[in-house]
């Protein structure tokens, strides 16, 4: 039996992100690419992260940084908060929250919120960049607990 997919889709890994990480399939939309990239962080698959970053941005230069990030973070969960189209048909956005523990900075759970931009080129989606978003203390926690941020991951 296959393991649950780290992307928190509720599907088994072999029926969810594994085909993307093994290059047996390509993501049909930005949210799927986002989920597979999150899974690549969990699985320490730096080659996949580089392969899905737009080639014009020279992602190879980030290999060392990506490797360190994978090794020094324990990823706990992903929540897709919103998806939206871009200004052109081949552009899309995914807003997400990823929970993790940084083994360098602290041993407490952190939440990273980002609005990532994706671009489709030659029928393939690529990660372009992202804007980190701040969660207000009285806003709902992006981890999905139903609590206010200040009473949950923002402590």
From Swiss-Prot:
Pfam family, one: YchJ_M-like
Disulphide linkage map: none
Gene3D superfamilies: 3.10.450.50
Family membership noted in the UniProt record: Belongs to the UPF0225 family.
Cited PANTHER family: ADENYLATE CYCLASE-ASSOCIATED CAP C-TERMINAL DOMAIN-CONTAINING PROTEIN, UPF0225 PROTEIN SCO1677
Protein name: UPF0225 protein ECA2332
Organism of this sequence: Pectobacterium atrosepticum (strain SCRI 1043 / ATCC BAA-672)
Upper classification of the organism: Bacteria, Pseudomonadati, Pseudomonadota, Gammaproteobacteria, Enterobacterales
């Amino acid at each position: 039996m296959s393991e649950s997919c780290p992307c928190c889709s509720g599907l088994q890994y072999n029926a969810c992100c594994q085909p993307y990480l093994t290059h047996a399939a390509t993501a049909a939309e930005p949210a799927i690419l986002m989920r597979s990239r999150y899974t690549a962080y969990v699985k320490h698959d730096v080659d996949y992260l580089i392969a899905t970053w737009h080639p014009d941005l020279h992602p190879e230069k980030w290999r060392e940084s990506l490797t360190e990030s994978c090794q020094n973070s324990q990823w706990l969960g992903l929540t897709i908060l919103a998806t939206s189209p871009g200004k052109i048909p081949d552009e899309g956005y995914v807003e997400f929250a990823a929970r993790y523990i940084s083994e360098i900075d602290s041993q407490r759970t952190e939440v990273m919120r980002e609005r990532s931009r994706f671009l489709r080129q030659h029928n393939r989606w690529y990660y372009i960049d992202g804007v980190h978003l701040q969660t207000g203390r009285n806003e709902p926690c992006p981890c999905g607990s139903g609590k206010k941020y200040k009473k949950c991951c923002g402590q």
